[in-house]
Each structure stands twice: as C-alpha cells, then as structure tokens.
DNA sequence: AAAATTATTTAGTTTTGTCTAAATAATTTT
DNA sequence: AAAATTATTTAGACAAAACTAAATAATTTT
C-alpha cells in the first residue's frame, strides 16, 4: 500500500465517513466537512481519481473504490488507536483526544501501529465507543440505535457518543452516563421530546432531546 | 512559542546538532546532512533568519539565536521521548526507533509531550544514551569521552552509542556491550588502533577502532 | 419553458518547499 | 598575484495544496 499525504488522508477519511450516511458524497458536503472551498475539493478529487482511490463523473457525487475504502480503514485504525492510547495511557479526557489524534494518524509506519495495538491489548473500541479496525481492516459492526429511538421499557447499554465536545462531556459526567452504562427509557414526552431514563435501580431522571440525539445504545 | 513546519524543524534540529561540533554551520554541511541541495538550504536560511531563529551574513556560516536554540531543544525533547517510548513500551529494537521518531517529533502538542514524559516516568536518556531535555529545555550534561580516548586502566561506564545502525547493534549485542556496561581498557594496539577491553571479571577481548569510535563512556 | 437559484468546475493566483543552471564570491594552488 | 577550484547565492521553474472570481451545469421556482 502506497503512502499518501496528510491532506489526501484527511479527504479520504471524510469521504468514507460521509458516504456511510449518504451512499455518495457531494462537493459541497465535503467542502463543508473539511472547512475548505468547493474548488479545492474538485482539485483533490481529480487527484484521488487519478490514483484510483475514488470513482466520479463531473457533477455526480464521489464514492471510494475498494482500494480507497481499505486506505480509509487504515487511517481510521491509526486515529482510533491513538485516541485510545491518549485516553487510557496518557489520561487525556475524552474531549481532548480527537485533535491530537488528527495529527498522529498521519504517521504511517505499519510496524508502529501494529505494535501500539499490541501494547494497548488490541482494544475493540475507541474512547467514544467507535470500533477500531484490526490489522486486516476488519471491525465490529454491532447494531447501534439512537437513544431517541429506543422503545420505552427496553434495557440497553450506552455504546457510543457522537458529539465529542467538552460541553457534552461535562453534561454526561454530571448525569453519570458513560460508555457501558446500562439504562432504560421510562417515558417519552411529546412536547419537547425529552426522555425520562433510569440507570439501574436509581431514581429516574430527564434528559433533553439534544442530548439523547448524540447517544447511541445497543440492546442487551 | 510559535509552530513550525516539519521541514523547518528538520533544518533547525540539524543546525543545532552541527553547531555543537563546529560552532558555526556552512551551507554545504547542512545540505549534506539533510540530503538536500545547497540552493534549498540558502532559501530556508533566509526564511529562518526572517523568523529570527538564526543569525547569518551571506557567505558566513549560520548560528541559531537563543530563540532558535530553544526551539531546537523542544524538537529534540519530542524526538527522544518518542524514541524512549518506542524502545521501552513498544519493544522496538534500538536501530528502529530513530526513523519513526523522525516523524513523530513533528506532532507538536505540548500537552501530548508533557503527558508522555510523565507516563514514561521522566526518563533522562533516550535508548542511545542521549540526554532528553525536560519541559524547560534543560538536560543532563555529563562529560562523555570517546572510548578511544579512555586511558588504559581507568574504569568507565558505556553511556552513549553514536551510530544507530542495525550493523553496530548486532556487533554490540554479540560483544555484550550495552549502555550502562562497566568496562576498562586493558591495552591499546598501535598498529590497527584496536583496543583490548574487559567487562567486570570476564576474560578480556578485542574491539576494533571503528567500533570504539562510536562508543562514549563516562568515568566512574 | 423561462427564469432564478444553487452546485460544481475552470482559470488564474499564492505559498511553501524543492530543484537545476548560471552567476558570483571566497579560498587554494600555482 | 593570477588562475583554478570550491562554496554560496541568485534566477527561474515546478509540484502540491490552497484560494478567489468567473464560467458553466443542474435543479428549483415561477
Ligand atoms: Mn476522533
Ligand atoms: Mn488528520
Ligand atoms: Mn534519533
Ligand atoms: Mn523529522
């Protein structure tokens, strides 16, 4: 597998993420995601097409090729292993890891990453609950549902938090919700879409729709 | 302290290393050290001068300013901490650490490095025996002498190996010489400048001038 | 179906870091 | 002290990655 520049890697990773949702990715979406200009996206897309990492016809959207997908998984593996390292070994808080991992992910020594993986004990998920691809690019694909769509009375476990800001971390810490927390929705209120939830045998409490939207759970 | 590009950092580090030896650094020396062309060096020197990291008059040599020296120590700190991490935690061998650290050193989060330092237990020297600057840029300055200049009969401890190749590591492992080994020169042979040395109470053995040149020791 | 709006691409610049070839300065040899 | 050699700088080009402004294509509104 060839080596790509940090810039190319950031584009590849963004396309991978966006195409999970929409199937195909547009110029404007990418420009917005990467905080760059549409014209810059077009330039880079031509380059990545030439390198056979993606397919696209002018004015249609982009899609990674099989090879492009493999490259993306490699970058995501590096990113999430570093995040795990920062949180677990260096005691970074949850909201601090992403920014640093955004740089570390571009150091591409295969040996470094495989040894790091081993040192960390082959973790399956990063500090936000996102799965870490293994050395062959395989990763866990457990069915996760948004907390807002969990039916009342169904026990579930928090598996993933999307938003990685300091603000959401503060709130989650206050509410004592972390990845792995087992909870149940008691009631859904139509007016403001807030949820009443219960953790274990503790008294139930309320969380806002905005918060619930960012929490994914798995059925148990 | 501002942020510098990987390229600028590699130049700064190289100047720092070379000026330790010669006091001042020339265009050709730098070009050779960095495997680049003299014209590229001149370009970069203008840039670093503009940023007040070095002093130079055309056709004289270069010297880092005080600020330039501080920046250099920061890069060296990152480089050596990563080398220590790779060797100690990830079990890289001695000859493999430098190349990877050459990339990792350019990830410049201060918090990352200070936490890494703490995680590693504030190590004083990297795997080759070179001192690691602390968070304030201070580092050990123990007097080291080349093994070829150690007088016969004076006990000393191996503190440092300059050459970092796989080849020298193989030889040192075979001879059971590592950093920290206590030894004594028994005899120096004029003909080929080979040395007879003894480790502890074991039988004495011979090492070549080429090998001895790359080993530094400290008196005990 | 035209017109208006929105999305995307193209054209032309800019910055950073590199290179080759040519010019000039400094040093060494004769 | 010239001449020859070596070191350094300058001039001009190039590639990567970004940007702005203008052109064009696609979509939506009227
Ligand atoms: Mn992340
Ligand atoms: Mn990144
Ligand atoms: Mn090194
Ligand atoms: Mn480097």
PLM segments and residue spans:
Chain A
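Key DNA-contact positions within bacterial/archaeal DNA-binding proteins
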Residues: 39, 95
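Mid-protein regulatory/catalytic core that forms ligand/cofactor-binding pockets
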Residues: 105-211
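Short, hydrophobic-biased segments on the C-terminal half of alpha helices
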Residues: 45-46
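Basic, amphipathic "hinge/linker" alpha-helix immediately C-terminal to the N-terminal HTH DNA-binding motif
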Residues: 60-79
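Short acidic, hydrophobic short linear motifs in intrinsically disordered regions
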Residues: 21-31
């Amino acid at each position: 597998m060839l080596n790509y520049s940090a810039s190319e890697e950031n584009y590849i990773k963004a396309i991978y993420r966006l195409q999970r949702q929409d199937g195909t990715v547009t110029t404007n979406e990418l420009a917005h995601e990467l905080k760059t200009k549409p014209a810059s996206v077009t330039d880079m897309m031509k380059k990545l097409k030439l390198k056979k990492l993606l397919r696209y016809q002018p004015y249609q959207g982009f899609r990674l090729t099989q090879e492009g997908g493999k490259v993306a998984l490699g970058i995501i593996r590096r990113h999430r292993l570093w995040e795990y390292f920062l949180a677990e070994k260096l005691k970074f808080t949850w909201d601090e890891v992403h920014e640093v991992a955004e740089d570390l992910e571009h150091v591409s020594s295969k040996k470094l990453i495989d040894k790091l993986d081993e040192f960390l004990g082959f973790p399956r998920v990063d500090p936000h609950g996102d799965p870490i691809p293994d050395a062959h690019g395989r990763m866990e694909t457990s069915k996760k549902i948004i907390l807002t769509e969990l039916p009342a009375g169904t026990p579930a476990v928090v598996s993933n938090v999307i938003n990685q800001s300091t603000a959401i971390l503060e709130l989650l810490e206050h509410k004592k919700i972390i990845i792995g927390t087992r909870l149940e929705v008691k009631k859904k209120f139509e007016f403001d879409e807030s949820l009443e939830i219960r953790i274990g045998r503790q008294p139930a409490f309320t969380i806002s729709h905005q918060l619930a939207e960012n929490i994914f759970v798995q059925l148990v």
